[in-house]
Amino acid sequence: MSWDQVWIDVNVATMDPSISAPYGAITNAAIAVKDGKIAWLGPRSELPAFDVLSIPVYRGKGGWITPGLIDAHTHLVFAGNRANEFELRLKGATYEEIARAGGGIISTVNACREADEAELFDLGRQRLNALAKEGVTTVEIKSGYGLDTETELKILRVARELGQHHHVDVKTTFLGAHAVPPEFKDNSDGYVDLIINKMLPAVIAENLADAVDVFCENIAFNLEQTERVLSAAKAAGLQVKLHAEQLSNMGGSELAARLGAKSVDHIEYLDEAGVKALSESGTCAVLLPGAFYFLRETQKPPIDLLRQYGVPMVLASDFNPGSSPICSTLLMLNMGCTLFRLTPEEALAGLTLNAAKALGIEESVGSLVVGKQADFCLWDIATPAQLAYSYGVNPCKDVVKNGKLVHQ
């Protein structure tokens, strides 16, 4: 056989639902890679003969290989920080109170408007490096800290540039409807007009976004405004998704389902009608335990209902300066289990197969199957559950991206 590399002495959590074992596991396995894709995968005892003198062989020392992790919800291109708001919250101020007083998203907007692309790129690269060290091979990056055409485009350009200069694949999302900027404080409909008539066409003209998102909440945009933005995005051929049901239940999830959204994110206040709608539309539920933890929320997402209706559950970092300044997917695995009572297998699926579904890329990544992209990680662990069980010592030993060893 002519392959580019072979991995042996490994166990593989394929996350392939067609394999009945937990995690889609194959123990005592081997993987062969050719032209950036998985060419062979199965028990080591069934590995076809190959020329060991000409093909690189990597030995996993009994560790576990998983698909490369996918962080399907981040805001990692931003300037400044909001440590002062952290102190205010510890003194009793709520996220909504801070936002209504002009803090929150708007304070980061001001910092991003002042920053140039070089500064934003450098900050973003540091954060992307941190995720990559934990086995992340694909990440979604949202805009939303510009709230004017120039700065929204600037953030999206930086996100695209990060993807061009880093081994991690970057999917970009235009989130101009993240908050109402000060200049439109009493005219949110006018700002929605600006998004639809000026911002979105400019984003499309430069091919800067793979999807469009809206923060559908009582401190941001109502259902009618959300539908206007997402309908315009769909008409332009872009995927749609939304932040919804984080602070209240406005019916955003049912709207998302009706529009065929890829995902609804946060969903702490999601009810059974919303869960049923997501199930019927195939929309993913993105759980963001970092924000739940950092904001000290008490209303948990309806995990049992999501299980009952078979809605794909995704885990993501929501890395951002205000509500989840936590740049770690491994910590999300632990939080998903300890805070939301996911099983370790559900948590890992939420950062692999289901995360790929939320980004519309499940045909190429998210599970380890012959023909899919060779994106995988080797972990120094005895069982996949260890990834969620323990935090603090990074067990990621090797990362293969598009068939190339990028971290060792």
From Swiss-Prot:
| Enzyme class, first EC level, given as a word | hydrolase
Disulfide cysteine pairs (residue numbers): none
What GO biological process term is on the record, naming one? L-histidine catabolic process to glutamate and formate
Q: What is its EC number?
A: 3.5.2.7
Q: Does the keyword Cytoplasm apply?
A: yes
Q: Where in the cell is it found?
A: Cytoplasm
Record: residues binding Fe(3+)? 73, 75, 243, 318
Pull one GO CC term from this UniProt entry: cytoplasm
Provide this UniProt record's keywords sorted from A to Z. Cytoplasm, Histidine metabolism, Hydrolase, Iron, Metal-binding, Zinc
Quote the CDD domains the UniProt record gives.
Answer: Imidazolone-5PH
Q: What is the catalytic activity of this protein?
A: 4-imidazolone-5-propanoate + H2O = N-formimidoyl-L-glutamate
UniProt-annotated binding residues for Zn(2+):
73, 75, 243, 318
User: Which GO MF terms are attached to this record?
Assistant: imidazolonepropionase activity; iron ion binding; zinc ion binding
Positions annotated to bind N-formimidoyl-L-glutamate: 145, 320, 322
List the PANTHER family: IMIDAZOLONEPROPIONASE (PTHR42752), IMIDAZOLONEPROPIONASE-RELATED (PTHR42752:SF1)
Protein name according to UniProt? Imidazolonepropionase
From the broadest rank down, the organism's phylogenetic lineage runs: Bacteria, Pseudomonadati, Pseudomonadota, Gammaproteobacteria, Alteromonadales
Question: What gene codes for this chain?
Answer: hutI
